[in-house]
A protein has these predicted regions:
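Amphipathic, interaction-prone secondary-structure segments
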Residues: 1-36
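Mixed-charge, Lys/Arg-enriched low-complexity segments
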Residues: 37-89
Length: 89
């Protein structure tokens, strides 16, 4: 499991290469402590795209969509690096 701080959210990403959908995302709102989303994805790209959409859907406060995208891009780069280190790229 890898945990990412994404502005007012926390994303926990789980990876299991033996599953059809190897990536699992748990998205939490840090302000309320609520779990907002659980999803299963095929690729890092799909996971990051859907994380960005979920963050925009759940905004209770006016976050800048560009800042949201940049935070998700940092997560994407970290996941690609992790996949490379694990030899899964």
């Amino acid at each position: 499991m890898k945990t990412f701080k994404l502005l007012d959210y926390t994303a926990q990403v789980f990876y299991n290469k033996d599953q059809h959908y190897p990536f699992c995302l748990h998205l939490y709102d840090n302000c309320s402590g609520k779990q907002l989303h659980v999803g299963y994805y095929v690729s890092v790209e799909q996971l990051c795209y859907m994380t960005h959409l979920e963050m925009l859907d759940w905004q209770y406060h006016a976050l800048n969509p560009v800042k949201t995208l940049l935070a998700v891009d940092e997560m994407k780069e970290s996941l690609y690096l992790l996949m490379h280190v694990m030899g899964e790229d």
